[in-house]
A protein has these predicted regions:
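A short, N-terminal "cap"/entry segment at the start of jelly-roll beta-barrel domains
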Residues: 1-38, 124-143
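A short beta-strand-loop-beta hairpin characteristic of the jelly-roll/cupin
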Residues: 50, 57-84, 94
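A beta-strand edge to alpha-helix "cap/lid" segment located at domain peripheries
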Residues: 73, 83, 87-88, 116, ...
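A short hydrophobic beta-strand segment most commonly corresponding to one strand
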Residues: 89, 103-124
Length: 143
């Protein structure tokens, strides 16, 4: 793995199927003058782990894939296979999920960029339904 795995992602465990780990790469306790810093965390997914469908409001999300193999899917579109070096730019308001392939660990760096005209600090995740085992297992043939 390219970056630290971090601690078990217990704070968000209810939004994941399987186990994930979170390693913040930028400090969280910034002063008001430093809030322009781009927040980044390394997220590690154990094999078969994925997050629920979700939507980012007030910000776009950028995923930089750094190790292993994963999946990214937008609602109503086919899943995209991810590998180290891939970058996914997710527009604000798009329903999506991402996670590891069934037989591979997967790491990505996640960051978000507030969209123009959003209220500072208004970015929020809307967590939705899990990706069903049936949906996920259909991807196994695409690996």
């Amino acid at each position: 793995m390219s970056f630290p795995i971090g601690k078990p992602n217990t704070a968000y465990a209810k939004y994941f199927t399987g186990n994930s780990h979170l390693a913040p790469l930028t400090p969280k306790n910034l002063s008001e003058n430093e809030k322009t810093m781009l927040p980044m965390s390394n997220v590690t997914f154990e094999p078969g782990c994925r997050n629920n469908w979700h939507i980012h409001h007030g910000a776009r999300q950028i995923l930089i894939c750094v190790a292993g193999k994963g999946w990214y899917q937008e609602w109503g579109k086919p899943a995209i296979e991810l590998k180290a070096g891939d970058i996914i730019d997710i527009p604000e308001g798009v329903k999506h999920w991402h996670g590891a392939q069934k037989d591979s660990w997967f790491q990505h760096i996640a960051t978000h960029v507030e969209v123009e005209n959003s209220q500072p600090g208004s970015e929020a995740n809307e967590w939705l339904e899990p990706v069903s085992d049936e949906e996920y297992n259909k991807l196994a043939g695409k690996e």
